[in-house]
Amino acid sequence: MALWGGRFQGETSALFKLFNDSLPVDYRLFEQDVVGSIAWADAIASVGIITATECSDLKKALNDLLVEVNGDPAIILASGAEDIHSFVESALIAKVGDLGKKLHTGRSRNDQVATDLKLWCQSEGAALLARLHSLHAELLALAEREFDAVMPGYTHLQRAQPVTFGHWCLAYVEMYERDISRLADALTRANTCPLGSGALAGTAYKMDRHALAAALNFAAPTLNSLDSVSDRDHVVELCSTASISMMHLSRMAEDLIFFNSGEANFISLSDEVTSGSSLMPQKKNPDALELIRGKTGRVYGSLVGILTTMKALPLAYNKDMQEDKEGLFDVVDSWAICLDMAALVLSGLKVNRPNALLAAQQGYANSTELADYLVSKGMPFREAHHVVGEVVVAAIAKQIPLEDFSLAELKTFAAIIEDDVYPNLTIEACLAKRDVLGGTALPQIQQAIAAKKAR
């Protein structure tokens, strides 16, 4: 049953119905639509539109419908309704007759869908927060297990300075903590109830919208009816928050894909999250990580989609806004499975310590320590930087590490170099000198892990 038929004399085109109907997408708002309708029944009862008995009958029928559909969700799509609101209203009328036709009094699908969508975002957002916390905990546990595993740190994908795997883990811990904060903030801003805003000008019935908001567990009602039905900031912000988090997931995936490559071989991934080749029997591919990286693009696409949809819409509601849900649902689904998969990857990850250490000892990653040593002897840093560059060129020509030069050879580059240079060139010294807040020295890593676990 269409909710708007009286104005029209001709039949709706079958093609237009297929084009216009949103039930194949917005069926996911069923529970929120029922919950909102139950609260609305109480609201219209409070202003005398229906009696207490009628309100009770409506609420019972709505709760019965909730149970029925949860038992057989296929009922919704089989109905052929235009949208989820039409389905709920038609099913309600089938249960209670003309009483069901009273429920929509004072309400528009505009404030109805805005409320449904915010309820859905609050529910799914809470589940996403839990997933982010789980990933954060898994990464912190990995940092604790491998806090002292030495590996090369990179800039420009070139070996730069030695770090620990624990330090690498904590870098992403910081990123996911910001994701948690962003999502929590977004949910706080979305925690207002549009119900009672009507089509655009507000409902004609003087109900208590504060009580209505509280009944639906919102922090407060919205304050402007035009904004209430036009606003999709919460959709944009959730997609934006997801996009930033997916960027972090994708960067982590890229790091791990490289660390897992035969060329690096710093880590091993569990069989649980890898697959093989149909042709090459030796292959063990990091498909979970590659899919995380790949799904990031579709999340970005949905963000751009909703921004483009909303960018030129006049107030208030426009049918364009029906396009807000498909991208949002896909964003939430993609983000959720990627968070779960990333946590699973980390839970079975093993660091190949000898390989990672060997790589850290190569590539002249201790060059900065030699420059710092020269500075400690009184040489200006810029001059020390130049001298060490010359030492590296000579070392490459001889195919030896810096520490294999004899003292006499080193003195040809800088006469101030003495025997005490060699302890400064060890991996242990490179790490130990970074004993500053945020640094890669082992005490700093341990303190950072302990502080985060204590929260």
Swiss-Prot record:
GO terms for MF: argininosuccinate lyase activity
Gene Ontology biological process terms in this record: arginine biosynthetic process via ornithine; L-arginine biosynthetic process
UniProt keyword Amino-acid biosynthesis, yes or no: yes
Keyword ATP-binding: no
Pathway: Amino-acid biosynthesis; L-arginine biosynthesis; L-arginine from L-ornithine and carbamoyl phosphate: step 3/3
Gene Ontology, cellular component aspect: cytosol
Reaction catalyzed: 2-(N(omega)-L-arginino)succinate = fumarate + L-arginine
Keywords: Amino-acid biosynthesis, Arginine biosynthesis, Cytoplasm, Lyase
Pfam family membership, one: Lyase_1
Principal place of residence: cytoplasm
InterPro entries noted in UniProt: Arg_succ_lyase_C (IPR029419), Argininosuccinate_lyase (IPR009049), Fumarase/histidase_N (IPR024083), Fumarate_lyase_CS (IPR020557), Fumarate_lyase_fam (IPR000362), Fumarate_lyase_N (IPR022761), L-Aspartase-like (IPR008948)
EC number: 4.3.2.1
Location relative to the cell: Cytoplasm
Superkingdom field: Bacteria
Recorded family membership: Belongs to the lyase 1 family. Argininosuccinate lyase subfamily.
PANTHER family per record: ARGININOSUCCINATE LYASE (PTHR43814:SF1)
Protein name according to UniProt: Argininosuccinate lyase
Originating organism: Shewanella baltica (strain OS185)
